[in-house]
């Protein structure tokens, strides 16, 4: 495989860790390296060192990775193209290099490989072949937006990009609506207005949404608003529809618990856990542990056990 000669191109924004005098060789393994999603200053020292020392770099698009690699002083990197269209066929070639004693660093155009980007098939193949997989964590659009969203509890479902076919998109949105919790979407600029309309049609209740546009880049915007206001916000300024998008859609607001709900019976999971645990420990201890497993209240589980005696 010939080396990729990177020359020319725009100067990257920001500064990155300076090259070390020497980069020690890496052990033969697959290194899954997160790269910046927009601002090159977000590259970690460990990621920079790994990329400099790797025998090979498996890149989603060597042209897109050029500014980053140039900024790290990797001007003659040995590159392998590994993208969505060739990952399955290329995986065995990559693994053969590792079996031969060489190290391979896996990167995507931006962010963490395998998260709405190629990489998962190669990583799975490496595990199946008994090859060591070493994560080198860093930037990810999902955690970047989550950190700036203010989501109580931080619990959400990661969906990423929806299918492009209308029927499949509708099915996924219906499933997300039925799930009832917050979820994360990625979207391209040419589909963002259509997505806003689809979300309003699929979701009931007064939900909130946090829109992250051009995260970590020069024109970054992070805006939190009612979901119903999203179409108007997009139309208010042509710039609002430009760039790459990450959206965190909150779950529906919690309904006040009625007296009837407050006195509802424990869940089936809680009752089953209580039944099994009561065979080996006192009822109150079993109720506390069953409550931790099921989310039910320990007192209700305990009272339910007493009624069954």
Model-derived features: positions:
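A contiguous loop/helix-start segment that scaffolds small-molecule binding in enzyme catalytic cores
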Residues: 2-9, 16-19, 27, 182, ...
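Glycine-rich, flexible N-terminal cofactor/catalytic loop recognition
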Residues: 2-84
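General beta-strand structural signal in soluble alpha/beta enzymes
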Residues: 59, 133-138, 185, 211
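Glycine/small-residue-rich loop that forms an oxyanion/phosphate-binding "nest" at active or ligand-binding sites
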Residues: 91-144
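Class I SAM-dependent methyltransferase SAM-binding "motif I" and its flanking Rossmann-like core
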Residues: 121-179
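Short active-site oxyanion
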Residues: 51-57, 130-134, 182-183
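Loop/turn-to-beta-strand initiation segments
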Residues: 28-30, 100-105, 181-182
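Conserved helicase motor
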Residues: 80-88, 162-165
